[in-house]
């Protein structure tokens, strides 16, 4: 599996400018790049349509502007499709991909949009133009499957394994009691298939997100509307703060998902297999300083100083600035 875009689309800071560069490499006979709408700051929100099949897949990334790993993987997937002439996918599926839903947040490297709103808490109110763009696309496209692409912080680990949650998934709930219906079970089966494919490559590093119900979250809303939805959370791979290794694993997961839809291999996976994926938990710091000396009463009785890297935009690059935080 090649990643030809890795040389031109890399790092953590990914904006519309990078999208436009990558779009120039796309085969116009396969991909149709459109403008789905505008952001608060009037930046274009792009969508990429391709495929002619009856099964429709909607994907969006960078709903949170500072979560760019999955965007890189999505661009890798587009490149892979044209480089490998994936007619089996193109004839079976119709795709609508929104690589950056929150271009203002991407440019400012913030989770929220230009109005300071978390778009993943706006699925009921639809108070923001970006939320309306996604909802209009959803209602017009009428997907059979929705893929909600995010990043998670380096602090997340998997269960009691003492390993980072390099990739986590969720089949969102559709009600407060977290019941299982056909819609949600289908998402669970696809997730289980992807998790199984990653087991040998990153053993103990695939997690399951908490499934508490919140109708304001887009995945919960779409599942409530009876569209199977899968949350992807790209996390930390050891010594990979630029998330280039994680990018490859997200890409691989998408390939496995699409192949499993073709072959129906997901059908052998059960609810129990999904539940066996351990939940991710906040278990890590970036650096733990021990055996230090200080006269400060607040610090001297601590076992260690927990250091977290604050991702900070500096001159078009993300720098990781150390901060001490006991929260």
Predicted regions and their residues:
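Short glycine-biased active-site loop of nucleotidyltransferases that positions the nucleotide triphosphate
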Residues: 49, 108-111, 220-223
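Active-site/substrate-binding loop(s) of hydrolase catalytic cores
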Residues: 54-56, 68-204
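Short beta-strand-to-loop junctions in surface cap/lid or active-site-entrance loops
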Residues: 46-54
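Short glycine- and acidic-rich boundary segments immediately preceding or forming the N-terminal edge
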Residues: 1-45
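C-terminal accessory segments enriched in acidic
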Residues: 1-19, 141, 170-178, 182-327
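Short hydrophobic beta-strand that contains or immediately precedes a catalytic carboxylate
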Residues: 58-61
């Amino acid at each position: 599996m090649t990643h030809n875009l890795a040389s031109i689309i890399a790092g953590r800071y990914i904006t519309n400018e990078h999208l436009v560069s990558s779009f120039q490499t796309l085969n116009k006979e396969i991909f149709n790049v459109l403008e789905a709408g505008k952001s608060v700051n009037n930046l274009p929100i792009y969508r990429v349509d391709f495929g002619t099949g009856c099964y429709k897949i909607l994907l969006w990334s960078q709903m949170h502007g500072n979560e760019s790993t999955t965007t890189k993987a999505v661009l890798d997937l587009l490149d892979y499709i044209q480089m490998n002439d994936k007619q089996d996918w193109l004839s079976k599926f119709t795709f609508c991909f929104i690589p950056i839903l929150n271009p203002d947040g991407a440019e400012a490297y913030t989770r929220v949009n230009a109005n300071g709103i978390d778009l993943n808490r706006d699925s009921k109110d639809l108070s923001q133009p970006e939320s309306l763009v996604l909802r209009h696309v959803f209602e017009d496209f009428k997907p059979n499957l929705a893929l909600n692409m995010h990043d998670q912080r380096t602090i997340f680990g998997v269960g009691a394994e003492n390993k980072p949650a390099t990739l986590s998934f969720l089949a969102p709930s559709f009600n407060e009691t977290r019941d299982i219906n056909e819609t949600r079970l289908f998402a669970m089966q696809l997730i289980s298939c992807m998790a199984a494919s990653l087991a040998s490559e990153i053993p103990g590093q695939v997690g399951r997100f908490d499934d508490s119900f919140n109708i304001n979250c887009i995945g919960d809303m779409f599942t409530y509307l009876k569209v199977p939805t899968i949350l992807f959370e790209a996390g930390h791979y050891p010594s990979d703060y630029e998330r280039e290794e994680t990018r490859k694993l997200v890409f691989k997961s998408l390939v496995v998902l699409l192949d499993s839809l073709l072959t129906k291999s997901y059908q052998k996976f059960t609810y129990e297999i999904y539940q066996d994926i351990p939940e991710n938990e906040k278990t890590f710091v970036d650096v733990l300083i021990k055996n230090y000396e200080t006269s400060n009463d607040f610090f001297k009785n601590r076992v260690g100083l927990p250091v977290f890297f604050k991702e900070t935009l500096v001159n078009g690059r993300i720098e990781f600035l150390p901060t001490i935080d006991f929260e």
